[in-house]
Regions:
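Core dinuclear metal-dependent hydrolase active-site scaffold
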Residues: 1-57, 139-204, 330-337, 343, ...
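Cap/insert and terminal regions of metallo-dependent hydrolase folds
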Residues: 174, 197-284, 370-375, 393-458
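Active-site neighborhood of phospho(di)ester-bond hydrolases with catalytic His/Asp-centered motifs
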Residues: 30-33, 59-68, 75, 87-90, ...
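Short alpha-helical
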Residues: 70, 95, 170, 258, ...
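Pre-active-site segment of Zn-dependent metallo-hydrolases
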Residues: 11-13, 23-85, 89-144, 195-205, ...
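Hard-cation-handling environments
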Residues: 239-380, 447
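Short active-site oxyanion
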Residues: 60-61, 83-86, 249, 278-280, ...
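Metallo-beta-lactamase
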Residues: 104-169, 299-339
């Protein structure tokens, strides 16, 4: 009779979130995300799924904290490999996860076709197959059970989950899981998923994840502090104006979910206040267009300011005169030939795939242009190389000189920094908290976060190791 947890991903790294809760013989998986980074390495890790010793069919239920790819990207693969249990998530997470997973299936199919044709030209053998396809996504979607915030629900014998708002992206949650084994031992665990930030546009602030015995905590920015939201607006205003004065293009790699909508919101505000010139703003991402539509139908997730814009003032924060959405490949290609000044927001946020790569191929060589980094860039990604100051980068099969200006605004991050995390922890009963497990961070960030939490008075802080089973009851 026992209760234990084990991290199968996002332990001593940021991507691939998967945490296994075992209560006697019952297995609950919290998140099933994809690894990102260098393609071959990430692909091998994703195909390993839960490792050699755990079959997908042995998982009784999946709790999904939110719809980012590194938390939901392998859900269809899990179902394909034999998982038949329920997937518990908020309704907004369900809608966004459907979009993310379907897009991933399409990208994999396209990559397989392209790589197959390239191998054929070289008379080479090609046997790479996508992890999953559209059918697998549809099958996984049939397993979703939507759960509202603050509505505890039994997900297995002796196991209950309650969702609280994590303030990270639309529909994101903390999962407070109460587990009781057959011997009568009870443990209340708090899974932070990704901890959000106060004062972010559109969505509500993170709630208090109190009344817990064990905490599994996001540590992405354990060694960094963010700019304030107001500083970020001024910085964005400055970058737009300087690029416009050079008659250049401002190219912004952005995740299609949340980051793009937040950028639209902020550019709308700057435009309405006359702080930036009336130049074309293009969102070149089919998924971002669809995600923005999903944002529009989930007002239950809005903060008061955004809710009032929609309901009291009947104003759409995701639409204004300068904003355009590209709806075809031809629209996207035309942007590469268009003259500046203009702004292009495009996915993928880490520049690993998608239309952003074509905009970078056409724009990096021009010193009038700016590439603005507004989110986390995992090690090994093109975005990380640009952020770290590379003078030449490889995109697809060609090399490109980096003459464009590279700027960064980290205040758009949806992850709390270390100080915000410590402040958020003030609401938790520290004397009740028996143990904290740090996940979702690179080694330097995890070690720094451990030190900050010790300084804040937390005891028994563990940096979780991949595959290590921690018995908690």
């Amino acid at each position: 009779m026992s209760i234990s947890i084990c991290s199968l991903g996002a332990a001593e790294e940021v991507t691939g979130s998967k945490h296994l809760l075992e209560v006697d013989s019952t297995r609950i998986l919290i998140d099933c995300g994809a690894f990102q980074g260098k393609r071959a390495k990430a692909d091998n890790k994703n195909r390993a799924l839960l490792g050699d010793d755990i079959e997908a069919s042995s998982i009784d239920a999946l709790v999904l904290t939110h719809a980012h790819y590194d938390h939901c990207g392998l859900v269809p693969y899990l179902a394909k490999k034999g998982f038949t249990g329920n997937i518990y998530a908020t309704s907004a997470t369900r809608d966004l996860a459907n979009l993310i997973m379907s897009d991933s299936a399409h990208i994999q199919a396209r990559d397989a076709d392209y790589l197959s044709r390239q191998a054929e030209k070289r008379h080479e053998k090609f046997d790479w197959k996508p992890l999953y396809d559209d059918f697998d996504v549809i099958r996984a979607m049939d397993q979703f059970v939507t759960v509202s915030y603050h509505r505890p629900i039994s997900i297995a014998d002796g196991i209950q989950v309650e969702f609280l708002d994590a303030g990270h992206i639309l529909g994101s949650t903390f999962a407070r899981i109460t587990a009781k084994d057959k011997a009568g031992n009870v443990a209340i665990l708090g899974f932070s998923g990704d901890l959000g930030r106060k004062g972010k546009p559109i969505i509500k602030d993170p709630e208090c994840l109190d009344k817990i015995d064990f905490l599994i905590l996001d540590s992405t920015y354990g060694n960094r502090l963010h700019e304030s939201t107001m500083d970020a607006l001024r910085h964005l205003e400055d970058v737009v104006n300087r690029t416009a004065e050079r008659r250049g293009k401002l190219i912004i790699p952005a995740f299609a979910v949340e980051r793009t909508q937040e950028l639209i919101f902020c550019l709308h505000l700057l435009h309405d206040q006359g702080r930036i010139p009336d130049i074309p703003i293009w969102v070149d991402s089919p998924m971002a267009l669809n995600a923005t539509s999903i944002f529009a139908i989930h007002p239950e997730c809005y903060d008061k300011e955004t809710y009032d814009l929609f309901t009291t003032h009947a104003k759409n924060p995701f639409g204004f005169s300068a904003l355009n959405f590209s709806r075809s490949v031809e629209d996207s290609k035309a942007l590469n030939q268009a003259k500046g000044p203009l702004i292009i927001i495009s996915a993928d946020g880490m520049c690993e795939f998608g239309r952003i790569q074509h905009h970078l191929m056409h724009g990096l060589g021009d010193s009038a242009n700016t590439v603005l980094i507004v989110g986390y860039m995992a090690e090994g990604t093109l975005g990380r190389r640009l952020r770290d100051g590379a003078k030449e980068v490889r995109i697809q099969s060609d090399w490109f000189q980096v003459r464009a200006n590279i700027e960064e605004i980290d205040a758009f991050s949806a992850h709390a920094d270390w100080k915000e995390t410590v402040e958020w922890l003030d609401c938790i009963e520290k004397e009740r908290l028996k143990r904290t497990f740090l996940v979702h961070g690179e080694p330097e960030a995890l070690m720094a976060m451990q030190g900050h939490l010790q300084d804040a008075g937390l005891k028994d802080i563990e940096i979780a190791k991949t595959g290590v089973i921690y018995k908690i009851a």
